[in-house]
Curated annotation (Swiss-Prot):
GO terms for molecular function: serine-type endopeptidase activity. It comes from Rickettsia prowazekii (strain Madrid E). The active site is at S43, K106. PANTHER family: CHLOROPLAST PROCESSING PEPTIDASE (PTHR43390:SF1), SIGNAL PEPTIDASE I (PTHR43390). This is Signal peptidase I. The keyword Disulfide bond does not apply. The gene is lepB.
Length: 264
């Protein structure tokens, strides 16, 4: 074997080692520190829109099987390690107890031991209603009009919620404006979507969410588009044709938007 071949082999090994190191670092960051998520639904509209790309922090609540595991069938341990208590008003990515194969993103409203009820769309926590003020309207990209409300939780966390606006004086949806009383069990939490009329949350089928099911705390939007580009069901030609309109659909105003800054 000549010297050129030896040097070539060393170069290949060095490049492979560098590549493997980068992959390992990326995996550690994804598993332990931060993970990006894409939001496919409008249950948090207009705080979070469809096709918003969310950056979330894994370390915010410590780690559980559902935050560390890449695959649903791998069960590393029970409970959480390095657990940190979530705060009321956090936007949380979690596994819903009724379908562990998917991820939900909602706003945390009720803590363990809380008594929660909605009366005429107003949230009552332990028999005290939160501050809620109508501040205007929001018209979605689909042309649907919403009433916009500013809500403040007992810990001072402020955010906006949205209700479908009346059409010719008729309220389109009033199904979940008044609820039964919910008593949040120990170790579990109560969630609502900011889009109150179009959210499958703790008022409906979701129920309470165990702390163990928390994956990460959503922090900011790092990218956003009006349409989806990648689709496993379409061919390469259609993907190429779809690339230009996808780029044109980028929502520049939403890039690097902090999810906890209330900008009126």
């Amino acid at each position: 074997m000549n010297r050129d071949n030896i040097n070539s082999n060393k170069t290949v090994k060095q490049e492979f080692g560098s590549f493997a190191f980068v992959i390992c670092i990326a995996l550690v960051i994804r598993i332990l520190i931060m993970e990006p998520f894409t939001v496919p639904t409008g249950s948090m509209k207009a705080t979070i829109l469809e096709n918003d790309y969310i950056f979330s922090t894994k370390y915010s609540y410590g780690y559980s099987n559902y935050s560390l595991s890449f695959f649903d069938f791998i069960h590393l341990f029970k409970g959480r390690v390095f657990a940190r208590e979530p705060e009321r008003g956090d936007i949380v990515v979690f596994r819903p107890p009724n379908d562990m194969s998917v991820r939900y993103i909602k706003r945390l409203i009720g803590l363990p031991g809380d008594k929660i009820q909605l009366i005429d769309d107003v949230i009552y926590i332990n028999d005290k209603k939160i501050e809620r003020t109508e501040v205007g309207t929001y018209i979605g990209e689909d042309g649907i009009k919403y009433l916009k409300f500013k809500e403040t939780l007992p810990n001072g966390r402020t955010y906006f919620s949205y209700k479908l606006a009346p059409i010719f004086g008729v309220i389109p949806s009033d199904r979940y404006s008044n609820t039964d009383v919910f008593y949040v069990p120990e170790g579990q939490y109560f969630f609502l979507g900011d889009n109150r009329d179009r959210s499958n949350d703790s008022r409906v089928n979701l129920g309470f969410v165990p702390f163990e099911n928390f994956i990460a705390k959503a922090q900011f939007i790092w990218f956003s588009t009006k349409i989806t580009w990648w689709d496993n069901d379409i061919g390469i030609i259609n993907l190429i044709l779809k690339l230009k309109p996808w780029i044109e659909s980028v929502r520049l105003s939403r890039i690097f938007k902090n999810l906890y800054n209330v900008d009126e």
